[in-house]
């Protein structure tokens, strides 16, 4: 990052009236740095323009950052506190919630206390990493462990689950890593909204093609796909020469119903929101 033509004066402004005080510019525009304090040899920093001057001691300053820490992994309580921001349908309008790498405790909370309470959004979930990335039991047990994880979750038409994680390039850290597929599942729904409508299925070869995949943590075969789909888990499959595809469009609703399909649940969410909005203007007429 480079920021030019800045000032040490707190009231300094550019020709268009925006602040060029270096502290404000760094804190508002930098993606990596938060200003803490003036360096020792910066004369009159933080004063007004009339108080600021230059002397021979004001030399370019170079500072190296060291001793940082990535901190501790967030706890379930902290994550729940963050997700609870979406709990009120009146305050926050949201259609899709990403479960990221949620464990069973967090996934149940999102389903029961956010999506089932709001009834106007869907959460996208993935298996736990230990079940599908270098399976902690033994290779070949991925489908069984994924189904076991799904069976710890409640039945809900407001939740969707895929079958694996994907291996992709992380451009921000210049490494390859596994990431849960629920972000891609949500992305397919958004792309379907853009190209068609929410009541079209986001799965299949026409609308379910997943991008930016080096490989899948597990590529289920037909027998495994049948078991996963029966449990309400949507398999993600790489077909040679045809790409990687979301090969199912079920919700986590356990009982047979039209609402065990993603597109049906999303159709009714759209209808209910539209009816609610329209009825506001006739409520007291």
Locate the predicted segments by residue.
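Extended, beta-strand-rich, solvent-exposed assembly scaffolds of outer structural proteins
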Residues: 1-15
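Structured, hydrophobic secondary-structure cores that serve as assembly/anchoring elements
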Residues: 11-14, 21-22, 33-34, 38-285
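Outer membrane pore-forming secretion/assembly proteins and partners of Gram-negative envelopes
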Residues: 17, 28-30
